């Protein structure tokens, strides 16, 4: 295992990138290009609802999908997750050789410090999507990215978000961990990510992104991805 806060002591071959709530694998387009340039094979699947529909989909349903996918990938392998995807990555960290958490929803006890929200059984982000509100939510993105995101937001399971907000107990991962915190994240306060990183003795990368999704969809997404790729596969 790498020393705390140091780059991983192996060259990661593959990486599974797990998107956040209401999004999809498309969110990782910039990261995919960068990782491939660094010789890292990437998978960016969409999380799928359960057979009983989105309203019945649970956090465990998503965890099962992530575990099946990461187990199929050659080692050394990394799990990379953003927002809810970060929490899912934490829950599957036993299958990874390195873990990257981008503005992750934190596990308990830090989850208690998240802003409280009420979630319906199906969160209608697709139905209620508006280009203007999309642009406001990602001020660091260019117009083309904002338009693409507006057209691709999806509805989400309220049960998954309620479980995450209530707090999920996760032990400190045995693998190397890199946490990324946006300076102006209004959804997951950057200090929460910093506190998690300190407790887990993980490396903390603070980025100037102006939103929760900035490290993936902002103009600096490729630069952030390059820093991560160098940490995963030091040359």
Q: What residue spans do the PLM features occupy?
A:
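Active-site glycine-rich loops that stabilize anionic/oxyanionic intermediates
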Residues: 20-24, 83, 183-184
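Serine-hydrolase catalytic-loop signature spanning alpha/beta hydrolases and amidase-signature enzymes
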Residues: 22-30, 42
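Conserved alpha/beta-hydrolase
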Residues: 35-54
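Flexible "cap/lid" loop of the alpha/beta hydrolase fold
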Residues: 94-125, 157-167
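Short beta-strand/loop motif that positions the catalytic acidic residue
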Residues: 173, 179-181
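Catalytic histidine-centered segment of alpha/beta-hydrolase-like enzymes
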Residues: 210-223
């Amino acid at each position: 295992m790498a020393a705390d806060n140091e780059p991983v002591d192996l060259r990661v071959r593959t990486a599974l990138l797990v998107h956040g709530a209401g999004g999809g694998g498309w969110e990782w387009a910039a990261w995919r290009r960068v990782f491939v340039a660094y010789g890292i094979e990437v998978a960016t699947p969409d999380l799928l609802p359960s057979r009983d529909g989105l309203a019945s989909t649970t956090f465990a349903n998503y965890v099962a999908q992530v575990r099946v996918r990461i187990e199929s990938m050659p080692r050394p392998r990394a799990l990379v997750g953003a927002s809810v995807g970060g929490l899912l990555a934490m829950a599957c960290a036993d299958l990874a050789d390195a873990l990257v958490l981008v503005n992750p929803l934190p596990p308990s006890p830090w989850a208690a410090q998240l802003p409280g929200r009420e979630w319906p059984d199906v969160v209608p982000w697709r139905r209620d999507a508006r280009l203007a509100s999309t642009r406001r939510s990602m001020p660091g993105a260019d117009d083309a990215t904002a338009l693409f995101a507006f057209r691709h937001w999806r509805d989400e399971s309220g049960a998954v978000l309620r479980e995450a907000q209530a707090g999920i107990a996760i032990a400190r991962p045995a693998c190397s961990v890199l946490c990324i915190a946006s300076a102006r994240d209004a959804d997951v306060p950057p200090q929460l990510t910093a506190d998690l990183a300190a407790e887990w003795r993980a490396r903390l990368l603070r980025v100037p992104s102006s939103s929760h999704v900035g490290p993936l969809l902002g103009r600096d997404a490729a630069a952030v991805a390059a820093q991560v790729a160098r940490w995963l596969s030091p040359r």
